[in-house]
């Protein structure tokens, strides 16, 4: 036994603790420091005091997509183990703008944008988290009262040299790309959140590792027990290349219609499907490994893609919605028209095909409409449109763009 009076008592690593550690580690990129976290779990089990687990999200956009749920799923697993989950809305840090992974300064949001986005943030996150067991906090609670004096004192706790250890800052500095002083404040303020919340564990994407470590360092300086950090992989988007992002158009929003969600998930590659199983499915790793073995043995990978799509749709909607989405998908695959397509009434016949598609809400612009026509992706009542100069006469007809976009159009003069 250690004679060091500052050493902490060791708590027994029981089977319960080993199970909790295994649940925690599933699908993670990194857990720092694992031995410390095992002791935190052991202490929690021995004392009955739950750990305080923090996830901060800046409301930079109003919608949450499946990429966000990778870390939310992990929060739910930890919540189900009995720990306290803190869903931290970064309404103050959003005013600064997170520079993580950026090669240029990210423009900060306005207060109005932040408040608007934050309204829907937790409602969507609650589709994953247990609402009754989640503590919701806003970091403006402790960041706003700091004032200039407190901000300067906080800034004195970290050096510019340490900030430049961060890869994205280093690249910008070496490349002569400007770095604003306020960007150095972001990791400091995120780290200070951990001090204010006395966090035991903080979660984030792999691009957040530096910021999470700042929190650990600040806790030490403030005399707190240091948080452990857990980073989750960034989910690739539908293209399988870049990370899922609304701005890149390769995302699946968790509030999308069941049919749209199902169709998007069925569009991913067979290779990407296994990545989605690992990061998004709640099935056991043994079951996923068995599925993969069956696919390699000759079973159609589509069977497993359907299972994945149904599981995810059911989670955010219902099992009945998932079944209907499958029926709808199979119907469309056979060339059928879905039952629930929107009805649109337009005027101005004869109307240019590009304008018709745009006004019907099937494309964002006429240039996008013309591109789809060039690719043979536009149909009127099942007939492919090839003439980009087509003028559509008055009447009622079904218009289709791509595989999933339909509208029942009534066009008048």
UniProtKB/Swiss-Prot annotation:
Recorded catalytic activity of this chain's protein: tRNA(Tyr) + L-tyrosine + ATP = L-tyrosyl-tRNA(Tyr) + AMP + diphosphate + H(+)
Domain S4 RNA-binding, first and last residues per copy: 351-411
Name under which the protein is recorded: Tyrosine--tRNA ligase
Primary residence: cytoplasm
Subunit text: Homodimer.
Biological processes, Gene Ontology terms: tyrosyl-tRNA aminoacylation
Enzyme class: ligase
InterPro entries, alphabetized: aa-tRNA-synth_I_CS, aa-tRNA-synth_Ic, Rossmann-like_a/b/a_fold, S4_RNA-bd, S4_RNA-bd_sf, Tyr-tRNA-ligase, Tyr-tRNA-ligase_bac-type, Tyr-tRNA-ligase_bac_2
Listed EC numbers: 6.1.1.1
Span(s) of short sequence motif 'HIGH' region: 59-68
Position of sequence motif 'KMSKS' region: 243-247
NCBIfam families listed in its UniProt record: tyrS
Function: Catalyzes the attachment of tyrosine to tRNA(Tyr) in a two-step reaction: tyrosine is first activated by ATP to form Tyr-AMP and then transferred to the acceptor end of tRNA(Tyr).
HAMAP family in the cross-refs: Tyr_tRNA_synth_type2
Molecular functions (GO terms): ATP binding; RNA binding; tyrosine-tRNA ligase activity
Residues the record lists as binding ATP: 246
SMART domains assigned: S4
Alphabetical list of Gene3D superfamilies matching this protein: HUPs, RNA-binding S4 domain, Tyrosyl-Transfer RNA Synthetase
SUPFAM superfamilies named among the record's database cross-references: Alpha-L RNA-binding motif, Nucleotidylyl transferase
Family designation: Belongs to the class-I aminoacyl-tRNA synthetase family. TyrS type 2 subfamily.
Provenance organism: Burkholderia mallei (strain ATCC 23344)
Pfam entry (one): S4
GO cellular component terms listed in the entry, alphabetical order: cytosol
Record's subcellular location: Cytoplasm
């Amino acid at each position: 036994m250690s004679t060091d009076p500052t050493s902490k008592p060791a708590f027994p690593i029981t089977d319960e603790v080993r199970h909790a550690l295994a649940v925690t580690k599933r699908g993670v990129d990194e857990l720092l420091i694992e031995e410390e976290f095992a002791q935190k779990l052991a202490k929690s089990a021995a004392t009955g005091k739950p750990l305080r687990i923090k996830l901060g999200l800046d409301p930079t956009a109003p919608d949450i997509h499946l990429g966000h749920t990778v870390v939310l799923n992990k929060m739910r697993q930890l919540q189900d183990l009995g720990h306290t989950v803190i869903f931290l809305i970064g309404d103050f840090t959003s005013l600064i703008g997170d520079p993580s992974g950026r090669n240029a300064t990210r423009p900060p949001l306005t207060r109005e944008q932040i408040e608007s986005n934050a309204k829907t943030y937790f409602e969507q996150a609650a589709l994953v988290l247990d609402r009754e067991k989640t503590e919701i906090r806003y970091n403006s609670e402790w960041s706003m009262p700091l004032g200039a004096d407190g901000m300067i004192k906080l800034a004195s706790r970290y050096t510019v040299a340490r900030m430049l250890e961060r890869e994205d800052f280093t690249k910008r500095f070496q490349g002569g790309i400007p770095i604003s002083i306020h960007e150095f404040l972001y990791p400091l303020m995120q780290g200070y959140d951990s001090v204010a919340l006395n966090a035991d564990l903080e979660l984030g994407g792999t691009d957040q590792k530096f910021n999470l470590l700042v929190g650990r360092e600040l806790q030490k300086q403030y005399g707190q027990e240091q948080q452990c950090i857990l980073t989750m992989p960034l989910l690739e988007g539908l293209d399988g290349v870049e990370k899922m992002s609304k701005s890149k158009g390769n995302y699946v929003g968790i509030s999308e219609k069941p049919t749209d969600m199902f169709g998007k998930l069925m569009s991913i590659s067979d290779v990407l499907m296994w990545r989605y199983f690992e990061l998004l499915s709640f099935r056991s790793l043994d079951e996923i490994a068995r599925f993969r073995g069956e696919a390699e043995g000759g079973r159609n990978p589509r069977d497993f893609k359907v299972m994945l799509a149904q599981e995810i749709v059911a989670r955010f909607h219902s099992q009945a919605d998932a079944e209907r989405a499958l029926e709808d998908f199979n119907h469309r695959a056979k060339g059928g028209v879905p039952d629930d397509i929107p009805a649109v009434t337009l005027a101005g016949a004869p109307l240019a095909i590009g304008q018709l598609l745009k006004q019907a809400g099937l494309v964002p612009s006429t240039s996008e409409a013309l591109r789809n026509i060039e690719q043979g992706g536009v149909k009127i009542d099942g007939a492919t449109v090839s003439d980009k100069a087509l003028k559509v006469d008055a009447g009622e007809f079904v218009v289709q763009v791509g595989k999933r976009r339909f509208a029942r159009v009534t066009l008048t003069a």
